[in-house]
Swiss-Prot record:
Name of protein: Serine/threonine-protein kinase ppk1
EC number annotated for this UniProt entry: 2.7.11.1
Gene3D superfamilies: Transferase(Phosphotransferase) domain 1 (1.10.510.10)
Organism per entry: Schizosaccharomyces pombe (strain 972 / ATCC 24843)
Pfam families: Pkinase
A molecular-function term among this protein's GO annotations: ATP binding
Active site: 623 (proton acceptor)
Residues the record lists as binding ATP: 498-506, 529
InterPro entries: Kinase-like_dom_sf, Prot_kinase_dom, Protein_kinase_ATP_BS, Ser/Thr_kinase_AS, STK_Kin4/ppk1
GO terms for cellular component: cell cortex
Disordered: region residues: 55-119, 285-314, 333-381, 883-906
SMART domains tied to this protein: S_TKc (SM00220)
Length: 1023
């Protein structure tokens, strides 16, 4: 029999007699208890479901007597019935569209006085409940006065729990009377009773609000304690989102003192005090999870019971997605999620006919007590309706889902919608590019995309999709699977971009599971350097050379980046390297301003060990700088970026391009960063330089930067950022090395031997490893830099001429170069050594197309520095000395600056911007510089702007300067008049520092010069 939903379209409250007479007899169902209030539409949304009442366990020869002709039971049938009949079997399965819970309980015949069991399908109570959920009665009918003196029976919505006896002589629950028997009953028998205020010594009632039980029969006398044998029955009325505690009229209660937060009221029979029952679900061991409107699902609750006197097996059905756990105890049931979409309920008892004791205090589940999955007993299962197919279950291995609990007051449809992720939100969570191993295995081993569902309301292992959502889920799955093609590169998953440049991109990656690769990967993450392969240009050649060098070096040294694989696709080449997650050494120094001597010594020893290992393998890096030195998790050095690296000596097999020189490591390519590169790269007259000595110079610059926090030769006032490369290297060659005060003696000594402009006088690698500064790290050199251990190995360049077939991975159809390299033409040494652009986007040295312009005396701008497009935006000027800690450097090996006479060369270098040919008698005007500070020993210089300009123009007199520093005027004036090419500087000492070339305009005030903050202040020139 199909249930017809109950609709109330009238504004007035209809009589309960009309509601009962027009209602159908419907089977009662027990449903789950949820904290979330369902909307009003939930009363009629679930159209077909199957419910089944199981036979009551009887004693003796009592047999059930079902009625097959009529679903109604008359009063005579009820009187003659002494057992609990089965209302309908599997063939006759009427459905009822509701979420109510019934009150099947034992009762007694009022006329005979003998016990009998409820056996009818009565929907009058359900109709009244549905009616009362839409109509609130604020006044008590006059018929209720004999039972209760309360003025109103509007109580908070709560589950209905009653304890009745099996041995009572009268009916303990409301039953419907037929119209033919209504005349035989007296008026008092037809008086409706409000169970909310039914009080007795032995009866404890927890009822629902807004319930009127008109035309129901109740026992004339209340049984005593001796006649009672309690049994628990749970009723959950419909909870709508429209009802809340704020709408309750608490003033109308006469005996109510407290109302619980969940709206559950427990009425005690011994006193009129009403105590709240805040954990009703917990007392029955029920823990329910909230459902959502988007999960159009049907869960099935099956129940199985052991032989237990007076208990009914429960079968629950609802459109909500449930997660129910019943505590496993002596007197309570146990419900747990099974592997499928069904739930099983098991009632445990010690003996077969043991009586059920009264409910004890509510127990709470601890974290260690997890409900075990129980098996489903036969004969106790049912299907979900004809309109709803079997819910589909998708298992999520190793995917943790957090479950959110909601209280009864705050749970509503609005809150539910806010917590439901949309399809776009799921895609934005980057499930396809997971950051951990568990999600990675789920996405790529199971080959399943995340469906459109609310994972917060599902269990930890399963979530369910109804048939209505199959189409949406399949479309989303196809969309997500299609988008995964853009996230793979060979047998690797591409992640975020961590670096860009002219050559291409550097991306994070993860190896796909089940990939046929014999390469040992120390970490699950890798770094993939991707270069376009559409054109056979110098970038591709450099990439192939880098692959050959890294493959020839092997993964034997801990301070050199590890090579893993080479991938070739239709349009790209890629080098797969080990991921170093500590960042660049540049950022590490910049965050700490400078490093301690012990830390810098340890990092420098690791750097020297790695570079010495490269040299022993015949490899020159040629681009050592702070940006190419990485740090791992333990803050250890890892040398990376071999874009400029090349080979030399007996490792070079290209004999037709070999150099007939005594030194096999001579090169002619001007590469690398200017501030780290050795000066012989530009100033060498022969055009050749030693690659090993150039790497040693770069190591010295890195050590100086770690100790000081800034670079040693980047403070030229006329070339602040080293844009003019020839002038930069001239400045390096002609400027003595000055150290800060906090440098230790051993660090100064090793830097003096490394940072020598002449490569012939520069210290060798073996002498550096034996220096006293690195004496505490000798064990590192003995392990990885032993001369006997560095035996000759096959040349890395020889691999460039070897061609072999590429191994094809079983996971992807893209060729993966795991053990061999395939290159087209043979790369000559000229192409390896003469190409200017770098793969990593470093500074590119190019000849200027503009005419040669003289910058200063003897210096011409014949070569300028141009950064490559899209190069890394990082200036060396970030590493500067702190402005608030500027101190003059101490001049070593000189007791007094005034006693030592500097040479003419030093004087000309200090005043090169003011020198003019002696043949020109025009006055000197400072048009290219702006003096920042002029300091004399133990004197303070204070002068006006006109005095300074007159001094520089040669139109000065002693009156401008007074008697403070007359020697300065005399010497400058004699220099301007060209009295002699060299003059006596015995009494003069001047430290001049400039900021930047700037046209002198307007009136120059010396007080402004004193107030300016100096950008850098390192070099001191003495004359």
């Amino acid at each position: 029999m199909n249930a017809q939903p109950f609709h109330n379209n009238t504004s007035d409250v209809q009589s309960f007699q009309d509601i009962i007479s027009n209602s159908y007899q419907k089977p009662l169902s027990l449903v789950d208890s949820t904290d979330r209030a369902l909307p009003d539409s939930s009363l009629s949304s679930l159209s077909r479901s199957t419910f089944q009442f199981h036979k009551h366990h009887l004693s003796g020869n009592e047999n059930p007597q079902p009625s097959s002709e009529s679903p109604y039971f008359t009063n005579n049938e009820r009187l003659n019935s002494s057992s609990f009949p089965q209302i309908h079997d599997n063939q006759l399965s009427p459905s009822f569209n509701t979420s109510y819970q019934a009150i099947p309980s034992s009762s007694s015949n009022r006329s005979r006085g003998g016990p009998y069991t409820p056996s009818i399908r009565d929907d009058s109570l359900l109709a009244l409940l549905s009616f009362s959920s839409n109509h609130r009665l604020h006044s008590m009918p006059s018929q209720l006065q004999p039972f209760n003196n309360a003025s109103s029976y509007t109580t908070p919505m709560a589950p209905f729990t009653a304890s009745f006896s099996n041995k009572v002589s009268h009916s303990a629950y409301p039953t419907r009377r037929l119209p033919s028997q209504a005349k035989k009953t007296s008026a008092i028998e037809r008086v409706p009773v409000n169970l909310n205020f039914l009080q007795s010594d032995n009866l404890v009632v927890q009822s629902s609000p807004q319930t009127n039980f008109e035309n129901f029969e109740f026992p004339k006398k209340i049984p005593s304690k001796e006649d009672l044998e309690t049994r628990e029955v749970l009723l959950l009325p419909p909870q709508t989102s429209k009802l809340s505690n704020k709408n309750l009229d608490t003033k109308s209660f006469t005996d109510v003192n407290k109302i619980s937060q969940q709206g559950f009221v427990e009425i005690s029979s011994n006193s009129s005090k009403v105590t709240p029952n805040t954990s009703l679900h917990q007392s029955f061991g029920i823990a329910s999870s909230s459902s959502n409107n988007y999960m159009q699902t049907s869960s099935e609750l099956t129940s199985s019971t052991e032989k237990m006197n007076g208990s009914h097996p429960l079968q629950l059905s609802n459109k909500s997605l449930l997660s129910i756990h019943l505590m496993q105890s002596k007197n309570q049931g146990h419900v747990s999620m099974t592997g499928s979409d069904k739930l099983s309920s098991h009632v445990q008892s010690e003996t077969e006919n043991a009586p059920v004791s009264k409910p004890s205090k509510p127990n709470t589940l601890t974290e260690d007590e997890k409900p075990l999955q129980s098996t489903k007993l036969p004969g106790n299962s049912l299907t979900v309706g004809e309109l709803y197919q079997e819910p589909k279950s998708i298992q999520l291995p190793e995917l943790s889902v957090s479950r959110t609990t909601y209280s009864a007051q705050s749970s509503s449809v609005k809150n539910c919608n806010e917590r439901i992720p949309s399809a776009k939100a799921l895609k934005k969570q980057k499930h396809l590019v997971p950051e951990n191993k568990s999600k990675l295995q789920y996405v790529w081993q199971k080959k399943e995309s995340l469906p459109y569902a609310n994972l917060t309301s599902a269990s930890n292992t399963h979530f369910f999709l109804s048939e209505n959502q199959n189409d949406t889920s399949e479309r989303l799955t196809r969309t997500l699977r299609k988008s995964t093609k853009n996230y793979t590169f060979g047998s690797y998953i591409l992640g975020r971009t961590i670096g860009t440049g002219e050559f291409g991109k550097v991306k994070l990656g993860w190896p796909l599971p089940k990939a046929n690769s014999t390469i040992h990967r120390s970490t699950p993450q890798v770094v993939i350097k991707i270069v376009l392969s559409t054109k056979q240009n110098c970038q591709t050649s450099r990439l192939m050379r880098e692959v050959a060098i890294l493959k020839g070096l092997g993964n034997n040294h801990p301070h050199i980046v590890k090579y893993l694989d080479f991938v070739k696709t239709k349009h790209h080449f890629g080098i797969v390297l080990d991921y170093v997650n500590g960042g660049e050494l540049f950022d590490y120094i910049l965050a700490r301003r400078r490093l301690e001597d012990s830390v810098a010594c340890r990092l420098f020893a690791q750097l020297i060990s790695g570079v010495a290992y490269l040299h022993s393998r015949g490899v020159v890096h040629r681009d050592l700088k702070l940006e190419n030195i990485l740090l791992d998790t333990n803050r250890n050095i890892v040398i990376a970026d071999f874009g400029f690296a090349t080979t030399f000596g007996h490792f070079n097999t290209l004999s037709e391009h070999s150099l007939p020189t005594e030194k096999p490591d001579l090169f002619s390519t001007s590469c690398g960063s200017p501030c780290y590169a050795a000066p012989e790269l530009v100033n060498c007259k022969s055009g050749m330089y030693a690659g090993t000595q150039a790497d040693i110079w770069s190591c010295g610059v890195i050590l100086y930067a770690m100790l000081a926090g800034y670079l040693p030769f980047d403070d030229d006032p006329h070339n602040p950022n080293g844009e003019n490369v020839p002038r930069l290297y001239r400045y390096i060659c002609s400027t003595p090395l000055i150290f800060p005060e906090f440098f230790k003696s051993k660090a100064r000594d090793i830097l003096k031997k490394i940072l020598v402009p002449d490569p012939a006088k520069r210290v060798r690698m073996s002498a550096i490893m034996n220096h006293a500064y690195l004496r505490s790290h000798v064990s590192l050199f003995e392990t990885y830099n032993d001369d006997e251990a560095t035996s000759l190995r096959p040349s890395p360049i020889r691999l460039l001429s070897q061609k072999s077939l590429a191994s094809v991975s079983s996971v992807s159809s893209i060729s993966t170069y795991s053990s061999s390299i395939e290159l087209t033409p043979q790369i000559t040494k000229t192409s390896l050594n003469r190409e200017k652009p770098a793969l990593h986007g470093s500074i590119n040295l190019k000849h200027s197309t503009r005419p040669v312009v003289p910058i200063a005396d003897g210096i011409y701008a014949s070569t300028t520095l141009h950064p490559i497009d899209n190069a890394k935006n990082r200036l060396v000027s970030l590493l500067r000395r702190p402005k608030h800690k500027v101190k003059h450097a101490k001049v070593e090996t000189r007791e007094s600056p005034m006693k030592n006479k500097p040479t003419k060369k030093q004087h000309k270098r200090a005043f090169s911007m003011f020198e003019r040919p002696t043949s020109q008698k025009a006055p000197l005007s400072p048009v290219e510089s702006k003096i920042n500070l002029m300091v004399a020993p133990k004197r303070v210089l204070n002068c006006a702007s006109d005095s300074l300009r007159a001094l520089l123009a040669g139109k000065t007199d002693k009156s401008f300067w007074g008697s403070r520093i007359p020697f300065l005027f005399n010497k400058l004036k004699s220099k301007q008049k060209a009295v002699s090419s060299s003059f006596n500087t015995e009494n003069s000492f001047l430290i001049l520092q400039a900021v930047s070339p700037l046209t002198f305009g307007g009136c120059f005030k010396e007080e402004n010069a004193y107030g300016q903050k100096k950008q850098h202040m390192r070099h001191a020139t003495v004359f």
